[in-house]
Curated annotation (Swiss-Prot):
UniProt protein name: Uncharacterized mitochondrial protein AtMg01110
Keywords attached to this entry: Mitochondrion
A GO cellular component annotation in the UniProt record: mitochondrion
Organism from which the protein derives: Arabidopsis thaliana (Mouse-ear cress)
Subcellular localization, as worded in the UniProt entry: Mitochondrion
Chief location: mitochondrion
Matching Pfam families: Mitovir_RNA_pol
Note: A stretch of 270 kb of the mitochondrial genome is duplicated within the centromere of chromosome 2 resulting in the duplication of the gene. The expression of this duplicated gene (At2g07749) is not demonstrated.
Length: 251
């Protein structure tokens, strides 16, 4: 996990951080791929080779083979025969190192795609954002090579859920961004709106979505008369008004 923390394009510790960095580069072409059951279909040899390259074959055997490839279980088939089954793809549920292993190997695939697209480039490829199986690539050639690599690994990409945009639109970590990632058009959950009828819920909603005081009052069924006279009573006391607003809408 400490390795992931050092990769600016990884969103494990800050989900929106890679998107904000990518937005500063103002890319037009963006490919936001949705991987179908990636954690179930990701090949174990890919993870093993990456760990062997980073930490040596002995450590890779302990981390990967000891927990995945050599960890067999007996299953009873429909014919009544007991068969020994081992992992050749995917990862077991609850495995402690699952996220880090998958994320690191996913980064390696993106880097390999960049190397295949630009074999003579010496600078690291930075035009992407990654969070687990969420991937955004802001380079047409690298996106093409990435798709080719996943086809070779037999990891499917859902075209119906993927977004290939020429105007900077993408979906990343359940958030939908448009206009070169400058506008967040992600929907607000109905649960959050219903909880806004309580003061604590209103504060949380205002803090998360940066709502104005008038918007918060409208969510609590305030009419135009209330909104028009918001400042009337406390107008002689601007300091009190500012403090009261801050208390209502944010901490």
């Amino acid at each position: 996990m400490s390795v992931l923390r050092r990769i600016p394009q990884d969103g494990t510790f800050h989900q929106e951080g890679p998107i904000h960095r990518l937005a500063k580069r103002r890319p037009r072409f963006i490919a936001s791929f949705d991987l179908s059951a990636a954690t179930d279909r990701w090949p174990v040899p890919v993870i093993y080779e990456l760990m062997a390259c980073l930490f040596g074959q002995t450590m890779a055997s302990c981390i990967v083979n000891g927990a995945l490839a050599l960890n067999s279980c007996s299953l009873k088939s429909v014919t009544g025969r007991h068969d020994e089954v081992v992992f050749v793809a995917g990862q077991p549920l609850g495995y402690y190192g699952s996220w880090a292993l998958f994320a690191l190997s996913h980064h390696a695939i993106v880097w390999l795609a960049a190397l295949r697209a630009y074999p003579h480039q010496t600078r690291p490829f930075l035009d992407y954002a990654l969070l687990g199986d969420d991937i955004v690539i802001a380079d047409r050639s690298v996106a093409k090579e990435y798709r080719s690599l996943l086809d070779a690994l037999q990891v499917d990409i859902s075209d119906a859920k993927s977004i290939v945009s020429e105007t900077g639109c993408l979906e990343f970590a359940k958030r939908f961004w448009v206009k070169i990632m400058s506008k967040d058009l992600s929907p607000v959950s109905a649960k959050a709106v219903l909880e806004s009828y309580f003061l604590v819920g209103t504060q949380q909603l205002a803090y998360k979505y940066k709502l104005s005081p008038k918007t918060c009052l409208r969510l609590n069924k305030a009419g135009y008369r209330v909104l028009g006279q918001m400042d009337t009573t406390l107008r002689p006391y601007p300091g009190v008004l500012v403090g009261f607003r801050r208390y209502l809408v944010s901490f």
